[in-house]
């Protein structure tokens, strides 16, 4: 959950200082919805760059320990809702990102992949050469999770002898 990355400076959602308790023109749940993204991409990208992109964020002890457990053969997979990529930065190889990642982007029209820097550090609404909007590869509210990622997550959970749940208010 988001709580795993707060030590790295990534905001969570529900704590006192979390995104849901900050003041915006729209509630974060609205800003992070598919319909809002389609209707107000400029507003979405302002929020994205101001709140979701945290430059200089580094993996913390939790990320590093999970990667170490994986290297030792004691951890089969990391299943995360986080979109920050810090598990991979810590060295975890088998990371199932249920909500996607801000480090992957693609054109909504032609599907062409784009480097995240174009979205995360650009200005305005990023567009592809084909004219389509480039979006981060994250799951917005009103969108379904990736069936393949969910199936893999269910497989690892079913096969697990021990399940570590951290950083979430479940």
Residues of each region from the PLM?
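Conserved catalytic core of sirtuin-type NAD+-dependent deacylases
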Residues: 2-170
């Amino acid at each position: 959950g988001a709580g795993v990355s707060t030590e790295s400076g990534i905001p969570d959602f529900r704590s006192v200082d979390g995104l849901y308790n900050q003041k915006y023109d729209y509630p974060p749940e609205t800003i992070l919805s598919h319909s809002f993204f389609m209707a107000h991409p400029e507003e979405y990208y302002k929020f994205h760059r101001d709140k979701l992109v945290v430059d200089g964020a580094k993996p913390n002890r939790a990320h590093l320990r999970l990667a170490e457990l994986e290297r030792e053969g004691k951890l089969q997979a990391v299943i995360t809702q986080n979109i920050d990529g810090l598990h991979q930065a810590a060295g975890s190889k088998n990371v199932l990102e249920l909500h996607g990642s801000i480090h992957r982007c693609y054109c909504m029209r032609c599907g062409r992949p784009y480097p995240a820097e174009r979205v995360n550090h650009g200005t305005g609404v990023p567009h592809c050469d084909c004219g389509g909007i480039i979006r981060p590869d994250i799951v917005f509210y009103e969108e379904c999770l990736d069936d393949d990622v969910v199936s893999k997550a269910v497989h690892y959970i079913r096969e697990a002898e021990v399940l570590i749940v951290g950083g979430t208010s479940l």
